[in-house]
């Protein structure tokens, strides 16, 4: 069993998928597999995956479209790793040690099932290229105290952030496919209901691509 399954639910974003895979290839932590589940109607993502030459990559072309959340779950179903690391196709690791830092959080805190970090919000244009505008975002001390004392305060706001900013232990519940919005928040709440312990770093281990093409920012 590998330590980490990097799960990439992809849909029609070859530019983003290529950038993400390139960021994975240079990671200093190498005990991982990459699972790409492709919900695209064409072969553009598959072509990128085939030429990327990423070690330990598993490519799955969905025979029937799963939809956004269904594709998240499909990627996790194919995962064999001890830890699940969702990475959306708009996002990428900020530097070569970021996957190692994610793993360290759970390795050093066996009592926790969930860990999350800050993020670098990077503006993208209509075709997925960086515009040059970016800023870092992380949970505030006030909000960290709130959800540490009561995870139900996530009802007020998504203080954890995008799924790409998280890592969790295999065996977590699936994402709720009946929802269109706040899918990630609802998932975090069910995960913390089972085990309210979590680990956090305010450092931006991931860069989140922000564009008008996203389902949510």
What are these regions (language model features)?
Residues 2-5, 33, 186:
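Cell-envelope/extracellular polymer assembly enzymes that use nucleotide-activated donors
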Residues 30, 38-46, 64, 88:
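A conserved acidic beta->alpha catalytic loop
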Residues 84:
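Short aromatic/hydrophobic "clamp" motif used to bind/position activated sugar donors
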Residues 97-132:
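Conserved donor NDP-sugar-binding/catalytic core segment of glycosyltransferases
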Residues 117, 139-217:
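Conserved nucleotide-sugar donor-binding catalytic segment
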Residues 1-23:
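N-proximal low-complexity "stem/linker" segments adjacent to membrane-targeting elements
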Residues 62-79, 92:
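Glycine-rich, basic loop-to-helix element that forms the pyrophosphate-binding segment
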Residues 22-31:
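Short, acidic, metal-binding catalytic loop of nucleotide-sugar glycosyltransferases
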């Amino acid at each position: 069993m590998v330590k980490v399954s990097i799960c990439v639910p992809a849909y029609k974003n070859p530019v983003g998928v290529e950038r993400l895979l390139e960021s994975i290839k240079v990671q200093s932590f190498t005990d991982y597999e990459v699972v790409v589940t492709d919900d695209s109607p064409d072969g553009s993502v598959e072509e990128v995956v085939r030429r990327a030459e990423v070690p330990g990559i598993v490519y799955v072309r969905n025979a029937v479209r799963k939809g956004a959340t269904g594709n998240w779950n499909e990627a996790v179903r194919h995962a064999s790793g001890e830890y699940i690391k969702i990475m959306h196709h708009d996002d990428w690791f900020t530097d070569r040690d970021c996957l190692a830092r994610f793993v360290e959080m759970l390795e050093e805190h066996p009592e926790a099932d969930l860990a999350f970090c800050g993020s670098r919000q990077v503006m993208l244009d209509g075709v997925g290229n960086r515009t040059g505008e970016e800023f870092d975002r992380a949970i505030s001390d006030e909000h960290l105290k709130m959800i540490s004392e009561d995870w139900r305060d996530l009802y007020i706001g998504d203080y954890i952030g995008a799924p790409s900013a998280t890592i969790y232990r295999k065996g977590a519940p699936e994402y709720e496919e009946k929802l269109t919005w706040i899918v990630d928040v609802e998932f975090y709440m069910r995960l913390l209901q089972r085990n309210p312990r979590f680990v956090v770093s305010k450092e931006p281990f991931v860069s989140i691509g922000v564009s008008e093409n996203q389902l949510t920012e």
